[in-house]
């Protein structure tokens, strides 16, 4: 429950930059997701967060680099849309990739990679979590069908905090 409060506090933080808030969301999303055990090579394998496209986070990601999530070190990798994302457990698709969503998300359908973005139409394109702005606050919406097809599980606590959950509950 405390972790849920952290998400809410970050969403309200008026002094934090937009991408500092989004970095906190991306980090915290991973705390509330369970991946199939076969996704990781071994118990010590890191959790790889891939930034696809132009990195708009900048220094905001420095805060979450090398933290741990579920006893796994978080490693941030930077990828282009043409690169294979098989090494990623979570992928943030940058707004720079708006026109290439189908190209990026197509190969990821039914793959246990948590996809997150802040692009309009992301859920409709098959993405899993979309960051949105509601009343000047960063919120998020979830495509539960895409999450389930990928073999991932999202905590009910996180789903309760979502502005919208699309798909079959």
Model-inferred region functions:
Residues 1-169:
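Short hydrophobic alpha-helices and adjacent helix-cap/hinge residues
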């Amino acid at each position: 429950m405390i972790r849920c409060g952290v998400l809410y506090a970050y969403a309200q933080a008026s002094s934090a930059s937009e991408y500092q808030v989004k970095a906190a969301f991306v980090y915290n999303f991973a705390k509330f997701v369970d991946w199939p055990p076969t996704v990781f090579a071994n118990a010590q394998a890191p959790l790889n967060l891939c930034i696809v496209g132009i990195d708009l986070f900048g220094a905001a990601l420095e805060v979450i680099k090398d933290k741990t999530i579920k006893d796994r070190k978080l490693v941030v990798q930077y990828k282009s849309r043409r690169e294979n994302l098989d090494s990623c457990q979570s992928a943030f698709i940058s707004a720079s990739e708006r026109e290439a969503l189908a190209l990026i998300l197509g190969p990821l359908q039914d793959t246990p990679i948590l996809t997150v973005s802040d692009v309009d139409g992301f859920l409709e394109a098959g993405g899993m979590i979309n960051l949105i702005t509601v009343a000047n606050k960063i919120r998020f919406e979830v495509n539960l069908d895409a999450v389930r097809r990928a073999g991932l599980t999202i905590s009910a606590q996180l789903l309760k905090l979502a502005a919208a959950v699309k798909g079959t509950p």
